[in-house]
Curated annotation (Swiss-Prot):
UniProt source species: Haemophilus influenzae (strain ATCC 51907 / DSM 11121 / KW20 / Rd)
NCBIfam families membership: slam_lipo (NF041636)
Low complexity composition bias: residue spans: 44-59
Biased composition (Polar residues): 33-43
Protein name: Uncharacterized protein HI_0973
């Protein structure tokens, strides 16, 4: 569904209806007092769970963590340059006071609004001007996931001029009570990848799925991202409510690294970033039990 606006700094009031990816889609009513320039639509790229059973987890002896005000709640890649000459700078996100607002490198970016309901990906295009969401303006295009996650946000903020940066990001409400035993499967997940060497086929960006398994006894996280029939495997070590590791895939020329965090009660969700060692691709992912 699409909502159109023309004037700069307009407040978005929407009633959105999800469109299932790969199906004939659906339609809904929208409220707009203006003519086209800014568009918003949602899509659902999730696939049904293949296995929703989760082995029991020992949470009675959960490891309670102290969360401080200056703790790193997420992270972002600041992307600059053009295809073949891309540079990525990693920055930490240190606030999750509002998951609908992103604070990166001194910039405040609106991601969504309580009035916008989307279980899948939310796409906001600002056209040639600016869009205002809950009083916060941005001239960037946004791709944000997803309303299905109560404690996690991931996505991409796309610059349209040389004076602004493009970001991949993840952020959320850090887990305070980490499980200390058992294995948890995260079978419902989403991902977004950009490739600068045509490794995703006819597109340089695509959304897909993700799934993970966390072994809280041996402190290991394994999983994969699936985008455009390309699979990227992740192997990481768990430390507290964070994880870091490597990626491997026969579909990409360069292998890479992964990082992320657990979010919500008893680590019910996770989110993170991936990137190639040579910066030829990068992306973000999230998953939940």
């Amino acid at each position: 569904m699409t909502i159109n606006l023309t004037k700069f700094s307009l407040t978005i009031l929407v009633a959105l209806t999800l469109t299932a990816c790969g199906s004939s889609g659906g339609s809904g009513d929208s409220q707009s007092a203006h003519t086209p320039s800014t568009s918003i639509h949602t899509q659902n790229n999730s696939t049904p769970n293949k296995n929703t059973s989760t082995p029991p987890v020992n949470v009675s002896n959960a490891n309670n963590l102290e969360i401080k005000n200056n703790d790193k709640t997420g992270g972002a890649f600041i992307i600059s340059g053009e295809d073949g000459h891309v540079t990525l700078k990693k920055v930490d996100i240190t606030t999750n006071s509002d998951l609908n607002v992103l604070y990166i490198d001194g910039t405040k970016i609106p991601l969504s609004s309580p009035s916008i309901k989307s279980n899948g990906w939310l796409n906001i295009r600002s056209g040639t001007g600016k869009v205002s969401i809950d009083g916060i303006e941005t001239s960037r295009d946004l791709k944000v996931c997803c309303g299905k996650y109560t404690d996690t946000r991931i996505g991409k903020v796309l610059s349209k001029n040389k004076n602004e940066d493009t970001y991949f990001f993840y952020n959320g409400n850090l887990t305070r009570n980490m499980p200390v035993g058992g294995t948890v499967n995260y079978n419902t997940g989403d991902s977004i990848l950009s490739s600068y060497h045509d490794e995703l086929g006819d597109t340089d960006e695509a959304v897909g799925t993700s799934q993970f398994s966390a072994d809280f006894v041996n402190k290991k996280l394994t999983g994969s991202l699936s985008v455009n029939e390309k699979k990227l495997n992740i192997n990481a070590d768990i430390s507290g409510n964070t994880f870091s590791g490597t990626t491997q895939s026969d579909a990409f020329k360069s292998q890479g690294i992964a990082e992320g965090k657990f979010y919500g009660e008893n680590a019910k969700e996770l989110g993170g970033l991936v990137k190639a060692n040579d910066n030829s691709w990068s992306g973000a992912f999230a998953a939940k039990k």
